[in-house]
């Protein structure tokens, strides 16, 4: 779940009944899978593949969604950092609105990436952890270096810190590429070998209408 459903965000909120169960009834009569065996590894990979696809489908089916957004992060200090940055990007209302408007706005993506750990620190502190403990867990640590960051939107490189920041790109072609049912945003942090991804969707007028016209 850490690499799949935990990396899914439609609007950043969590329902009180968000739960994942994996159940085995034994009705198939198969032999039990032994822990740490080859079969266990294969089963784990199969479950993760199914979980990833279901998470993608849930993101695409978000309220009012017209675009499935996948953010893939590489070059992070570790996988946890990469997942945090990816989730911060797809959870950003400004990024989601830019996706809906077909705006290849690298600034919003960079800003969201830079805020990744700040959000985590707030969560830790809300859970009753001292601010110094939150900091020791990397909650407020800067994990994005703008001088090393690279951002690509729908296959178009739009920012490269190594060559001075924003790069010249065909904005019309980028906007056209963004006008698709699925969008891929890629970030290379240039800091290590960590990788991660997250799944979300755009923010549309229909989302506001749907969530403002009913009560629970």
Regions found by a protein language model. Name each.
Residues 1-216:
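A structural signal for small-residue-enriched, beta-sheet-centric alpha/beta enzyme cores
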